[in-house]
């Protein structure tokens, strides 16, 4: 007799119950970005296996360990933690609770812990493809960025990859990389908007705004420009921001995507099936559809970008990363 779906976490320790917990990084679970995508993937997996899924929103980084510990104490089977900054707390918890599977989204594992899988992405690949598109679309040869902090490797990989791709497509292009200072790097839409506005005023006509709410502020600002979608464009990040930040639609060329929903869902499913392995799991990356700007992107540009995506996938194109993290 198959047990019915698990509907709460009062008895997660029981063999027939499946409980999956997710701890967000600082920010809300509906952040229209990272936390939200990981939570959607977790929910999809829970639905398929008849499991119970619950999240805890982290308010302050000092609460990481405590939040993870709440799920562990309730004997959850699988705990997903979101974001590079939770890496250490996740490793400590995995060592303390060897019978629980941990999935660290954006947490590269230096040495493998058997019950901890790091879901990592080649951000430099998605960034490079987006940059290549920007290099072919710019009319002013000035390309801008408004990024989270480069103290978080995935953000730096996006930025450096973007710059490398833009210059590969257009050696004349001038690419400005601007990172937010580490404090509140992903929660500062005002900075994202002001930085994007400044670069538009300096002649940039394609801007990559990447970094949670900070980047979203940039996208929304660029979309207000009278030239949005004709002479001025923006590029989003992580997930297809056409759907998460609809205000950006007028300027949005594409988004440099990490397939977070799919990656999280795949690993949670593997965990529940008892097939998850410790170490790193490389999730898929790509570019989101052109949507409203589809008609202004020439066919030869689309074809060139497809070729670049194929070259990144088969390894024939080198982005210069991850070595770029050292410069």
What are these regions (language model features)?
Residues 1-327:
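A residue-level marker of the well-folded mature domains of exported/periplasmic proteins
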């Amino acid at each position: 007799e198959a047990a019915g779906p698990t509907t709460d976490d009062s008895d997660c320790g029981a063999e027939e119950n499946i409980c999956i917990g997710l701890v967000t990084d600082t920010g809300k679970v509906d952040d229209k970005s990272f936390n939200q995508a990981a939570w959607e993937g977790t929910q999809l997996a829970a639905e398929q296996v008849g499991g119970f899924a619950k999240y805890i929103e982290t308010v302050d980084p000092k609460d990481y360990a405590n939040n993870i510990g709440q799920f562990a104490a309730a004997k959850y089977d699988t705990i997903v933690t979101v974001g590079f900054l939770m890496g250490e707390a996740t490793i400590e918890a995995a060592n303390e609770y060897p019978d629980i599977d941990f999935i660290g989204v954006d947490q590269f594992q230096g040495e493998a812990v058997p019950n901890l899988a790091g879901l990592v992405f080649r951000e430099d690949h998605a960034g490079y493809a987006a940059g290549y598109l920007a290099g072919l679309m710019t009319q002013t040869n000035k390309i801008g960025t408004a990024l989270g902090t480069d103290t978080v490797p995935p953000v730096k990989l996006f930025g450096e990859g973007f710059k490398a791709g833009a210059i590969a497509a257009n050696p004349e292009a001038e690419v400005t990389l601007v990172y937010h200072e580490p404090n509140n790097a992903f929660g500062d839409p005002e900075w994202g908007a002001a930085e994007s506005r400044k670069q538009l005023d300096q002649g940039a006509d394609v801007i990559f705004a990447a970094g949670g709410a900070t980047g979203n502020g940039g996208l929304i600002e660029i979309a207000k420009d009278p030239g949005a979608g004709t002479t001025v464009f923006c590029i989003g990040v992580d997930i297809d921001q056409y759907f998460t930040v609809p205000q950006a639609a007028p300027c949005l060329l594409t988004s440099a995507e990490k397939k977070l929903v799919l990656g999280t869902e795949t690993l949670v499913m593997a965990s529940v099936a008892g097939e998850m392995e410790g170490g790193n799991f490389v999730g898929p990356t790509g570019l989101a559809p052109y949507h409203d700007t589809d008609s202004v992107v020439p066919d030869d540009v689309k074809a060139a970008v497809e070729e670049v995506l194929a070259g990144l996938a088969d390894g024939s194109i080198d982005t210069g990363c991850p070595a770029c993290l050292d410069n």
